[in-house]
Amino acid sequence: MKIMDIHTALVSQYLTPASAVLVIIQKKRLRESRRLRITFRQQMRKNQPNILFLQLESFFDPTLVNYLKISEDPIPTFRKLMKEYSSGYYKVPAVGAGTANTEFESITGMSLHYFGPGEYPYKSILKETTCESAPYVLKNLGYSTHAVHNNEANFYGRRSIFPNLGFDTFTSAEYMAEENDKNPLGWTKDEVLTDEIIKCLDSTEGPDYVYTISTQGHGAYPEEQLIDDPEITVTGAATEAQNNQWEYYCNEIHEMDNFVKELTDALADYPEDVILVMYGDHLPTMGLTVEDLKNKYLFQTEYVMWDNFGMEKKKVNLSAYQMAAEVMDRVGIHEGNVFKYHQARRNTKNYQVDLETLQYDLLYGKQYTYDGANPFERTKMRMGIYDTTLDSIQVVSETDHTYYIQGTNFTPSSQVKINGEWYDTVYVNPTKLIITGKELDDFDRLSVVQRSNSSTRKAMTKSHDRAVYALLADSKWKLDSEKSSSDTGSMEETDTALERNPQKIPVEENSTDNQ
């Protein structure tokens, strides 16, 4: 089928009649069409549910491994939810690694099968152009779009790629107050994500799309025993080292399963409708073969489509690139050329052949599907949900020049700059930092910067620069409201923070902001 035939088919055969009428009127660009489109979207916005995707790192059911003997079920919550809600197998484009490619399929509806061998679109085409995606499509219906990831922002280039996928905000580990809650391998635990997801929902009046990428289940899994007195024990593997790897893995995904319970419990009482799709991005890096698995398939995990408003339960197996279209279809959303295509053509003749042609047209061709012009503008994505603010300075000790830096939304990745130079900083809590060893002058200028956890350690965002004389608690330049909210703290709290952080954030020479 030619590209133009696909476009005609999308308009005339595979769209709902109402949608086809809207497309035809839009092509004529009549004034009346704009009014109809606005009215249609206003109707769509009413009572639209929040749509959440939770991509669980290396999460799958280890009881599917033939040779393992596991002392207890590592994922009782996920298994229970699979029985109670829509669920099935989730076909993914990767095994053992390749998180970003499962992510790409789930966000865009495009199949990695039609890219080059070993290609990561995040490292190729998406560095050059925007791309139709669930965030872009839902933004047109009044949704706010958020990404959440408890790892560094620059991993897989997400900080620069997500604006090309239509995200409004990105909360990475650098913007999480609990980013230092680590597992034995140093990955931030997934339990910190519950509050971050709720923050996204609370930050807007309208519906939200939140795509969350977890990290706790990440390898490489240790061959020695790292967990003392593990809750779950594992035997049956060929070597003791492999038993240790599986035992570590099972205990980590058990904690992830507890996080799933905590999150669904929190969302069950949320005052808005919520759909939450949860799935593993790929099998863990354990050298598994087809013969090792009861389901005989390596490129497959499982998903649950949970909700808090009583959707009909369905048992259906899906590919990652089909899931967003399925969710939209379940709630009556028929927008976006790729997603409408899946809704209309899945399980029909030439489905894959035409999908390949459609993807080529959208990413590499002349974009006939969009009348020759890419309609998606790169978003002005903000890092974090809320601004970092610098509100006041408290003198703790004049002897060793110790100060409290007070404000809002600090994290362990916050670092103070004085007159443009990095300064050693100790994180206390989301409203308090400590600096010590330098006497501040009234006219010194301070800011609090969120620094990347990547090797570059570049600045990502910062508070406004403010002069010391305007920040001191007794300054005549401070507003009355700022004075009344100042908290002098205690030396005991300072000592505790310094003991908890014996290694201060290092000062890096010749660093430059990347604003």
Name each region found by the language model.
Residues 37-48, 56, 61-435, 439-515:
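Solvent-exposed soluble domains appended to multi-pass membrane proteins
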